[in-house]
Amino acid sequence: MDKMNPPALGQASALFPDLEPPGGVGKATVLLGGSTGLTSSDMEFQKMLIDERMRCENHKTNYQTLKVEHTRLQDQYTRAQNELKRLLSDRQVTQEKQQLLLAELRGELLDKTRDLEELKLQVLTPQRLELLRAQVQQELEAPIRERFNKLQEEAENYRSEYNKLRYDLTFLKSEFDHQKEEHARVLEERRIRHEADVARLEHDKEDLATQLQSGDPARDGKRVEALLREKAQLHQRLRGLEAEVTELRAERNNSGAQAENVQRIQIRQLAESQAAVKALEAEKQSIRMQLDRTESELRLSQEQNTLLTGKLHKAEREINSLNSQVEEMKHTHKLELSNVKLECVRSKGELERERDMLQCQVEGLQSDIEVMKSALERNKELISEKEREMVRRVQAAREEEIHKMATLQEEKLELENRLSELEQQKALQEVTGNSQKEEWEERLRAAQLGEESVRKELQNLRTKVQQQGQQLEELETLKAENADLRQQIAELNLQVGTLSHSESELLDTNNRLRESLERVREDLRSARTQMERTQQEAERLVEERRVEWLEEKHKLQDIEAELREKYSQAKERLQRAAFAQKKRKTMTELKENKLKDKIQLLEAKIAELEIEAKHAQLSKRLRELQRRHNEFRRLLLGNQMTSSTPLAQSLLIPNESIFSNIQVSEEQHQRELCVLRRRLEELENSQQQQLEELAAPLDRDRERLSSPRDALPDLS
């Protein structure tokens, strides 16, 4: 009950006036005055609420109108943006078309300039003709000069090799003659020596035979000593002869190796000369092929000249067609440029009109925004004043409630004091009290509902204030968008300026293209005249070149004939060298046969010397036996003179047998010596016959070799 509202207490006091004591009339009047004050404040509060609701409705209507205006402005802005995008896309398309046209025209201009450069390059100027002539002459003369130099170098090499071979041949011939003379001298000396040795041996043999027949022991001893000395000398001579035989064998081997080396060298030289001859023939064929090639190239160059003249006429026709196309393109380009200019002017006027409209709209929006800002400021001031008034009223209501609570507590104390008095009346007043209580509760509920409605209205006001803040933010975004639109308008103005600049550049490029076309026409006229002159000069040069080629052909044929003569001469020389090589080979074979015969003779002499040595040994043994026999006989004769006859007879019998054996061996030795002499005579006769047979062809070869040697020219 202590939380009961003051209006309810006022109503309770108004409903129960008879409950107050007689002394509490002033207090009741006070309470009634407070209740009337409370009702007037409620009325004011309700009026304020109604005013606030009206203002809120006004704000709502203003907000709705602002929202509709904002949507309309947004639609206009989107339309303006779409229109700007469309204009930008159209402008971009037109720019792309113009750039494509410009690129195509530039490409065509570049192609035509390239064709003109190619035609200029194809046009034969006198300088280019001179360069071509020099280049062709270098290309044709360079391989021929290289081959001619190579042929000269090879001829020099062959000449030097031929001189070397000639010098080697003369040196070998002189060496061969010297060796032949030396060999003949050595053979003659050895033959004389062997004849002297044979005569001396025969004389010694006769002396030995006489000594054996005479039988003088002292003289035999001396002769044995002399024979021993002779034997030692013969051994030394035998060793010397063996050394000479080994030297002769080594010389034979060396001469065979030298002959083989010379033969191999000559075979290699023959092969090299044959290869050189083949190379010369191949080069001759290559020169012929090159001549054919040069003639075919000359024909091809003439055909190419005719083709170039045809291409030149075709290029002139194409240039005329291209000039007509360029004129057509110029005309179409002018029409397109005029259309583009008209479209640019039209789009420029539309853009200016739209810009003015947008500026008007932006100014209207700015004025609306300023009005709305001032209205918002006023609304903010009114809301702040109302909030301050509401705060003051709430504080006053709270103070009144506190005061009323204090008075209620006092009344409560008084009522508690009176409760005891009122308990008796309670039963009577329960029905009326319950009804009053319900009424009071209903009033309390109504007051609570009013308080809640006030709170809701405060919340609604706060939400409205927040919405107004959002609207202010949206207005700021609109300001930013308007600034963006202004920037876009400035960019569009810049693009319009660039379009006008590009239009002026296109006009300049068209003028330059016209000038370049005029220059190209003049160049074509000059090129045509120059082509005619160069064609005449080319025909004249072709005739001169044909004459030069014929002269060079005759020169090459003369060179070929000279090379053939040189080749035939070299071939004859090589044949003569091969014939001389064959002769040298036969001579070396004859030398080998002679050396073999000499070796056989030496081997026979060595065998004879061995037999003589054996004979000397046997004679030595015989003399030794004779000496011993004589000593034994002297001993026997000195000691037993009486009985010497039978012993002497017995001793003489073996002596006779010994002498018979010696005679048999001596006869055998004589037979062997006769056989050896016969063999030696046969060998000498065969050698003499071979020498006589070889002498005649050698003399003929010498005469032949001397005659070509005198006839051969010195190539150095």
UniProtKB/Swiss-Prot annotation:
Protein name as annotated: Centrosomal protein of 83 kDa
Annotated GO biological process: cilium assembly
Subcellular location: Cytoplasm, Cytoskeleton, Microtubule organizing center, Centrosome, Centriole
Positions of region (Disordered): 1-20, 691-716
Family affiliation: Belongs to the CEP83 family.
GO cellular component labels: centriole; cytoplasm
Basic and acidic residues: compositionally biased ranges: 698-707
Top-level division of the source organism's lineage: Eukaryota
Disruption phenotype: Reduction of olfactory cilia formation.
Intrachain S-S bonds: none
Protein keywords: Cilium biogenesis/degradation, Coiled coil, Cytoplasm, Cytoskeleton
PANTHER family according to UniProt: CENTROSOMAL PROTEIN OF 83 KDA (PTHR23170:SF2), NY-REN-58 ANTIGEN (PTHR23170)
Coiled coil start-end: 55-638
Function: Component of the distal appendage region of the centriole involved in the initiation of primary cilium assembly.
InterPro entries associated with the record: Centro_Cilium_Assembly
